[in-house]
A protein has these predicted regions:
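Alpha-helical subdomain
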Residues: 1-63, 172, 180-185, 189-333
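Conserved beta-strand/loop positions that form the S-adenosyl-L-methionine
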Residues: 176
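Conserved Class I S-adenosyl-L-methionine-dependent methyltransferase catalytic core
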Residues: 8, 12-16, 22-24, 32-33, ...
Length: 333
């Protein structure tokens, strides 16, 4: 978002109010409630157990944002809310996304007081820092909701990869860090000869199995629980796919080299930094948040990935750019 005038500056400084109002509406299910039946302010206040006066101002704020509209029967979702929220992802996935942003918010509170800290900002604020993966290891519920959310969000990406990848000679696929198996399931629909093994943490695998059971290709996809950085990986694969995993090292690539059959391919899909200490535009938001945890954090570049692949024994094949900016790097054993 680029600011062009003084009013934009004022709006940006107060944007946390609108963001919080929207996130609350999503987490409490307001748009879905109003889609079932229009309600006036007292009706919303009663349904969601919100003090009436506060609720009225909240609804007025959402109305000013163009997210709800008012008619004689009460408030209802606007056309924008219907097309951008109700008709896109499930209520559960939207609620997870809104909650995730809310949980990130404390990191940037009082940023002016803590941005000079030489270490993690949350520690200076007296808050705990826990990685995404650790939170999912400790909470099957969170892992399940996260996995279902990414399954919905990554449908376009799965379609793009199914169109791009040449699967000639590929019968056994390892989907490393594949979560729900969203990309695998798309490939399995297209290629009846293909089988896939998704490798991820146990709680994610549990959620993935549930999602896979809803598909006709369920018999051709399995889930292997493992910490792929520290544990051995299964072998004899024709292709390993590493899509939006975000963690790379030469040591990991050597393990993947060993897991592939001779002539097998490794396919890496991600937003990479265009240069050292320059964030990918698609990842600028997250890169900044990561720097609040680790002030020396830096995104890896495609050139660094390719160098690690070469050092691990791979032969580089191709580099493609998907709509949205993700790079697809392919290498052969």
């Amino acid at each position: 978002m680029k600011l062009t005038a003084m009013d934009d500056v004022f709006d940006c400084l107060s944007a946390y109010v609108a963001s919080s109002a929207l996130g609350t509406a999503i987490e409490l299910g307001l748009f879905w409630l109003l889609a079932e039946q229009p309600l006036d302010a007292p009706g919303v206040a009663q349904a969601l157990n919100i003090p009436i006066n506060r609720c009225q101002y909240w609804l007025q704020l959402l109305h000013s944002m163009g997210l709800i509209e008012q008619a004689s029967a009460g408030y209802a979702p606007s056309s924008v809310a219907r097309t951008a929220i109700l008709d896109t992802y499930s209520q559960e996935s939207w609620a997870f996304l809104a909650r995730d942003e809310r949980e990130q918010f404390p990191s940037v509170c009082d940023l002016a007081l803590h941005i000079r800290e030489p270490g993690p900002i949350r520690a200076a604020q007296g808050l705990t820092t826990q990685s995404y993966v650790k939170r999912m290891i400790e909470s099957p519920d969170r892992a399940g909701r996260f996995t279902r959310m990414l399954y919905e969000l990554h449908q376009p990406l799965a379609a793009q990869l199914t169109e791009l990848l040449d699967m000639t000679g590929v019968h056994r696929l390892m989907d490393l860090g594949g979560g729900s198996g969203v990309v695998s399931l798309a490939l399995l629909r297209q290629y009846p000869h293909l089988t896939s093994v998704v490798v991820d943490i146990e709680n994610v695998c549990m959620a993935g199995r549930k999602i896979a059971s809803e598909h006709a290709a369920a018999a051709r996809i399995t889930y292997h629980a493992a910490d792929f950085f520290h544990e051995e990986l299964p072998g004899e694969y024709d292709m390993v796919l590493q899509c939006d995993v975000g963690v790379y090292s030469e040591a990991l690539f050597r393990k993947l080299w060993a897991a592939l059959n001779q002539g097998g391919r490794l396919v890496i899909v991600d937003h990479f930094a265009p240069a050292e200490n320059v964030a990918s535009p698609a990842r600028l938001y997250w890169t900044f948040l990561d720097s609040l945890v680790d002030p020396d954090f830096g995104g890896i570049t495609a050139a660094q990935i390719q160098s690690q692949l070469t050092q691990a024994g791979f032969h580089l094949l191709s580099e493609d750019t998907l709509p949205g900016g993700r790079l697809v790097i392919q290498a052969r054993k």
